[in-house]
Amino acid sequence: MSSEIAYSNTNTNTENENRNTGAGVDVNTNANANANATANATANATANATAELNLPTVDEQRQYKVQLLLHINSILLARVIQMNNSLQNNLQNNINNSNNNNIIRIQQLISQFLKRVHANLQCISQINQGVPSAKPLILTPPQLANQQQPPQDILSKLYLLLARVFEIW
């Protein structure tokens, strides 16, 4: 009979230990479940906020920067071609002092525009190489000598956008 009592006490102790251990596991499991639920809710809220704001990815930002720089370059090159044609017309006509000054001014503008194209191409190269802080050396719109820029000039607006894009991203 003493062996039955000893066996009975052993079972009671084991059952109590299992109950305590089981309760501890339940508490820890609940704490982990709550922590996981909170983490999942935070991740879902962040994902929803990102989806609502529609923030571009890093690759999309790079692509937008390159597209903007290429668009600016296409406008700059179109204007260089236009100025070069004007320059050729001035050279074909009789050259006098007033035309000579005009020719020099046009050559300076062409040089300025081509420097901008070169700076933009360097920036595109750096962006494609993965340099995160790459930005063009010239972020201001070109100033046309002896002419006021009209407020609707697309190049001025694109340079303003360019400055903002490279400032934010």
From Swiss-Prot:
Protein origin, superkingdom: Eukaryota
Transmembrane segment boundaries: none
Spans of repeat Sequence: 28-31, 32-35, 36-39, 40-43, 44-47, 48-51, 76-80, 160-165
Subcellular location: Nucleus
Any Gene Ontology CC annotation: chromatin
Modified residues (N-acetylserine): 2
Signal peptide: none
Keyword line: Acetylation, Activator, Nucleus, Repeat, Transcription, Transcription regulation
Chain intervals for the UniProt region annotation (Disordered): 1-24
GO biological process: chromatin remodeling; positive regulation of transcription by RNA polymerase II; regulation of transcription by RNA polymerase II
Start and end residues of each stretch annotated as 6 X 4 AA tandem repeats of N-[AT]-[NT]-A: 28-51
Region 2 X 5 AA repeats of L-L-A-R-V: start-end pairs: 76-165
Main location: nucleus
Record's compositionally biased regions (Low complexity): 9-21
General function of this protein: Involved in transcriptional activation. Component of the SWI/SNF complex, an ATP-dependent chromatin remodeling complex, which is required for the positive and negative regulation of gene expression of a large number of genes. It changes chromatin structure by altering DNA-histone contacts within a nucleosome, leading eventually to a change in nucleosome position, thus facilitating or repressing binding of gene-specific transcription factors.
Subunit structure: Component of the SWI/SNF global transcription activator complex. The 1.14 MDa SWI/SNF complex is composed of 11 different subunits: one copy each of SWI1, SNF2/SWI2, SNF5, SNF12/SWP73, ARP7/SWP61, ARP9/SWP59; two copies each of SWI3, SNF6, SNF11, SWP82; and three copies of TAF14/SWP29.
Extra information: Present with 1030 molecules/cell in log phase SD medium.
Name by which UniProt lists this protein: Transcription regulatory protein SNF11
Taxonomic lineage from the root: Eukaryota, Fungi, Dikarya, Ascomycota, Saccharomycotina
